[in-house]
Every structure is written in C-alpha cells, then in structure tokens.
C-alpha cells in the first residue's frame, strides 16, 4: 500500500524522513528509521496510514527514547487502536506545537491544540512548541508583591503572590469550580488579565459542567467569543497517559504567550496536578524505567520542576497558578503531593463544614496558609489584623465543645464577647460572587484589600459589637454591613 504523504500537507523535505512501526505496546510504539535520519527526543511523529479495515489512522506521538539500532520509542497522544507493525510514520522534525494568542480565548482544545468544541477552526497566526525553557534568572521579577483577588478571606488570611503557585484543596461539592470562575472574572476586571484552564486527567463530565457554567456566567461569551476571558485545554481521564502527561504543558504554553508577548497577568488553573504525576508514572513504567518510591517514576521531581519553573513572574508579566491537589488516601507524605508542596507559595483549603453552614466561599480561615503573610511583605497593619482574626476564630473553635454541652450562658463575659465577634468575622468572610449572581440574585462584590483590612479591624476593635451578626452575612465591604444592619432594624 503506497501512502501519498504530500496529500497530508507535508513538505517533500519532511516527507523524506519516514520510518515504520516495529512494535506497539499499548500507548507506546517503537519506530525504525533509516541510518542517520533519527528524530530528536520530543520530536513529534505522525502515524498516517490505513488499518486492515481500510480506515484512516492519524495519530500524533512524541519521541521519548532513542533505543539504538536506528529505533526510537514514542508515546501516543491518542488511542493506538488499529495500529500495526510496518505502518508508515512521518517525523515532523519539530516538537508538538500549539496555537497561541487571543483567538484561543473562549475555545476548548485538546493536547495537540486542536479545537474540540465544534465551533470550527481557530484563526491563529502564531504557534509555540510545548517544550520551552523556563525564563532566565535575569528575566525574573524578584519583587514580592501580593496578587489582589478581591476575595476577602483569600486577600486577608492567605494572600496569593503575583507569579506564585497556590494549591487548592477541597472535596466534591464545596465550591471549587465557583471559586475558580470568580478568580477568572476578577483577574480580568482588576488586572486586565486573562486565564487558561488546564483540565488534566479529570472527569469529562466535570469539564463539560465547567464549560456550561462559564457560558452561563458570561466568563465565556457565546455571542461574541472574542470577548471571552479564558482558554480551556482538556486531557481527560479517558485519554491515553501521553495526552494527560502533556496537556498541562499545552495550557502553560498558551499562558506563556499572554505573559511574554502580550505582557499581561495570567491566571493558570491546573485541575488536577496529581493526575499529571500519575500520567507520568504510567508512561515511565511503559518506557521500562525502574520505579522509585510507591511505584512513582524515578524522574518525578524533574518532571514536576520542569513544569513548575516555567510558571513565574518576569519583568514583563506574570503567570499566577492555582493548582487543585488531590491527596491520595489523604496521605500528605505520598511522593506526588509531597513533591507538589515544595513548589507552593500558598494553600487555599475549602471546608465542607463551612459549606454546610452556607458560608461561601467555604475557605477554611485556619487551615489555609501563605508564605506572603509576613509583616515585612504585607505590612504590620495587614499582618496584625490577620493574626487577630485567626486568634479570635481559634478561640471560638476551642469553645465550641463547651457551648455544645453547657450553652453560651456558662461562658465568661470575655469569652462571650469573643464568640460574638468570631461569629461576625465568620459571616463577614462570606461574600457574594459575580459568577453566582445568576443563582443567588444578589450582585457580586469585589472588595479591595484596604477595605477588607478596615472592616476586620472594626469588628476586632469592638466598634460593631452592637450590630446583629446577620448584617455581616454575604456583604462586600463593612459599609454594606452597617447599611444592612440599619435595614434589618427598620424591618424589625
């Protein structure tokens, strides 16, 4: 069977370097090339042929190993069903390249940068290779600055670093998706930035739900797709490990364009960073490497470092990354989450208990941490206020058992005051979101860091002890709380 490679849009020059499959083991294949025509590591190979049923096969692979005897071992980015020994393979002579730029906003891509949302081809003029060097030391922005999100609980108690990495911990149904969408919305309004969402090895249903919710909350504008604020890249659970291992790099490459060329602040979401490690582990075993601790790949730290080092601030722009972290069997010492923690600047922990109370965002104020919460970075005023809030909430937590058994009346006057203030703080940490307006009917609020600090200082100082705690629930700044208290008084 003679294959016309020119019909596939390949130049005569590239079409000359053609190999053939010698072995297929699941998603891994060995390809033989002519002597002196060996492709480089990370080169993209394309299997273009027909299977025994006469159906076209078009599978992109990535070279991982040079085996000797003019053979290479490559990992397929899609299913290898129907592949046979002897099939022709084209060496493209370059790594995987993906489309970048404004045209990617509002669209969904797979690992190869192909649109999968049935909205037609993407009109792009620029493509970037997914394997790129991290910014050089001289390009890095070493200034520590806070990345204001407009979300009170985050900005006050676990502030994000501009160009930092944040771990997002939370089970199902505690508001992870809504928090992600609010951050996408706020970065556009406050920083004029864009977002890239990388769905790595998660459920297809969740990816679809996220897309539908983004359309509903206007993060993706269906009428005018170019006004959308986010590009989506999906490599879901059903994809081969090669795709799940590389989809994070595809999303990161799209984000790098906005940082380096457009000089914007970019939010990069990776959901879930554990699946990136898991896919690498599967590929490593298939490539015949000796596993290390708990069966993970021996190159775990290197793979994680290669991805994470590219996520940083430069003097031109920044990529701030929020990574959902799945902790297998809740074991924080497992090599996958343990390696991830080494790279994180802050953790945002979502609590099911707070979600059950109806306090959204359900960010746990005591479990969430940030390396930025230091007096010489955020300033004395911010630091003292945050510590005061945490101490009050911690004391309330300690007193809860006593309250449950004996009731509030058995507490000392001082403790009763602490409980009253803690309950106000807990409610004031809630906030109406812009992306939830559709469901709640109350308009979203962006609260600046200065207003957030002022509000919590007033609660801690006792200025607002006379106000009812309902006045602090789901409001923006402290002025809204006092206005709501006045309204409640009139109504009663």
Swiss-Prot record:
<dbReference type="Pfam" id="PF22919">
    <property type="entry name" value="ATP-synt_VA_C"/>
</dbReference>
<protein>
    <recommendedName>
        <fullName>ATP synthase subunit beta, chloroplastic</fullName>
        <ecNumber>7.1.2.2</ecNumber>
    </recommendedName>
</protein>
<dbReference type="InterPro" id="IPR036121">
    <property type="entry name" value="ATPase_F1/V1/A1_a/bsu_N_sf"/>
</dbReference>
<dbReference type="InterPro" id="IPR050053">
    <property type="entry name" value="ATPase_alpha/beta_chains"/>
</dbReference>
<keyword id="KW-0472">Membrane</keyword>
<keyword id="KW-0793">Thylakoid</keyword>
<keyword id="KW-0066">ATP synthesis</keyword>
<dbReference type="InterPro" id="IPR005722">
    <property type="entry name" value="ATP_synth_F1_bsu"/>
</dbReference>
<comment type="subunit">
    <text>F-type ATPases have 2 components, CF(1) - the catalytic core - and CF(0) - the membrane proton channel. CF(1) has five subunits: alpha(3), beta(3), gamma(1), delta(1), epsilon(1). CF(0) has four main subunits: a(1), b(1), b'(1) and c(9-12).</text>
</comment>
<keyword id="KW-0067">ATP-binding</keyword>
<dbReference type="InterPro" id="IPR004100">
    <property type="entry name" value="ATPase_F1/V1/A1_a/bsu_N"/>
</dbReference>
<dbReference type="InterPro" id="IPR000194">
    <property type="entry name" value="ATPase_F1/V1/A1_a/bsu_nucl-bd"/>
</dbReference>
<dbReference type="GO" id="GO:0045259">
    <property type="term" value="C:proton-transporting ATP synthase complex"/>
</dbReference>
<dbReference type="GO" id="GO:0009535">
    <property type="term" value="C:chloroplast thylakoid membrane"/>
</dbReference>
<dbReference type="InterPro" id="IPR020003">
    <property type="entry name" value="ATPase_a/bsu_AS"/>
</dbReference>
<dbReference type="InterPro" id="IPR024034">
    <property type="entry name" value="ATPase_F1/V1_b/a_C"/>
</dbReference>
<keyword id="KW-0150">Chloroplast</keyword>
<feature type="binding site">
    <location>
        <begin position="170"/>
        <end position="177"/>
    </location>
    <ligand>
        <name>ATP</name>
    </ligand>
</feature>
<keyword id="KW-1278">Translocase</keyword>
<dbReference type="Pfam" id="PF02874">
    <property type="entry name" value="ATP-synt_ab_N"/>
</dbReference>
<keyword id="KW-0813">Transport</keyword>
<dbReference type="Pfam" id="PF00006">
    <property type="entry name" value="ATP-synt_ab"/>
</dbReference>
<comment type="function">
    <text>Produces ATP from ADP in the presence of a proton gradient across the membrane. The catalytic sites are hosted primarily by the beta subunits.</text>
</comment>
<keyword id="KW-0406">Ion transport</keyword>
<dbReference type="GO" id="GO:0005524">
    <property type="term" value="F:ATP binding"/>
</dbReference>
<dbReference type="GO" id="GO:0016887">
    <property type="term" value="F:ATP hydrolysis activity"/>
</dbReference>
<dbReference type="InterPro" id="IPR003593">
    <property type="entry name" value="AAA+_ATPase"/>
</dbReference>
<keyword id="KW-0547">Nucleotide-binding</keyword>
<dbReference type="InterPro" id="IPR027417">
    <property type="entry name" value="P-loop_NTPase"/>
</dbReference>
<keyword id="KW-0375">Hydrogen ion transport</keyword>
<keyword id="KW-0139">CF(1)</keyword>
<comment type="similarity">
    <text>Belongs to the ATPase alpha/beta chains family.</text>
</comment>
<dbReference type="GO" id="GO:0046933">
    <property type="term" value="F:proton-transporting ATP synthase activity, rotational mechanism"/>
</dbReference>
<dbReference type="InterPro" id="IPR055190">
    <property type="entry name" value="ATP-synt_VA_C"/>
</dbReference>
<keyword id="KW-0934">Plastid</keyword>
């Amino acid at each position: 069977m003679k294959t016309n490679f020119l019909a596939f849009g390949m130049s005569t020059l590239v079409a000359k370097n053609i190999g053939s499959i010698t072995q297929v083991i699941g998603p891994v294949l060995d390809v033989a090339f002519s002597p002196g025509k060996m492709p480089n590591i990370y080169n993209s190979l394309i299997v273009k042929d027909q299977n025994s049923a006469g159906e076209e096969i078009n599978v992109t692979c990535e070279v991982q190993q040079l085996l000797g005897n003019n053979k290479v071992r490559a990992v397929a980015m899609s299913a290898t069903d129907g592949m046979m020994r002897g099939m022709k393979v084209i060496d493209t002579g370059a790594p995987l390249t993906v489309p970048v730029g404004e045209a990617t906003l509002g669209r969904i891509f797979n690992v190869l940068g192909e649109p999968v949302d049935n909205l037609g081809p993407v009109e792009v003029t620029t493509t970037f290779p997914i394997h790129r060097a991290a910014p050089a030391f001289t390009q890095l922005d070493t200034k520590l600055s806070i990345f204001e999100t407009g979300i009170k609980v985050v900005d006050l108690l676990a502030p994000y670093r501009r160009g930092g990495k944040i771990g997002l911990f939370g089970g199902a149904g505690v508001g992870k998706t809504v928090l992600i969408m609010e951050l996408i919305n706020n970065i556009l309004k406050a920083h004029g930035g864009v977002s890239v969402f990388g769905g790595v090895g998660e459920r297809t249903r969740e990816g679809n739900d996220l897309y539908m919710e983004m359309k509903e909350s206007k993060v993706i504008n269906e009428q005018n797709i170019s006004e959308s604020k986010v590009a989506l890249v999906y490599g879901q659970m059903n994809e081969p490990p090669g795709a799940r291992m590389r989809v994070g790099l595809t999303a990161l490459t799209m984000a790098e364009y906005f940082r380096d060329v457009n000089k914007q602040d970019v939010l990069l979401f990776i959901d879930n960073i554990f699946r990136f490690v898991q896919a690498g582990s599967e590929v490593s075993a298939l490539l015949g490497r000796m596993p290390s601790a708990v069966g993970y790949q021996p190159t775990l730290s290197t793979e994680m470092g290669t991805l994470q080092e590219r996520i940083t601030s430069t003097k031109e722009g920044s990529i701030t990354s929020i990574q959902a972290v799945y902790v297998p069997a809740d074991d924080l010492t497992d090599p996958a989450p343990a390696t991830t923690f080494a790279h994180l600047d802050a953790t945002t922990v979502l609590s099911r208990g707070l979600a059950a109370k109806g306090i959204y965002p359900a960010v746990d104020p005591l479990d969430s941490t940030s390396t930025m919460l230091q007096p010489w970075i955020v300033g004395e005023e911010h630091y003292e206020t945050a510590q005061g809030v945490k101490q009050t909430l911690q004391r309330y937590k300690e007193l809860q058992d006593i309250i449950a058994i004996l009731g509030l009346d058995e507490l000392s006057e001082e403790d009763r005051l602490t409980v009253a203030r803690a309950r106000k703080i807990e409610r004031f940490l809630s906030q109406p979101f812009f992306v939830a307006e559709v469901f709640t009917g109350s308009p979203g609020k962006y609260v600046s860091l200065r207003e957030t600090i002022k509000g919590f200082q007033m609660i801690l100082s006792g200025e607002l002890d006379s106000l009812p705690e309902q006045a602090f629930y789901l409001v923006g700044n402290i002025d809204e709380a006092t206005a709501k208290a006045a309204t409640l008084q009139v109504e009663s």
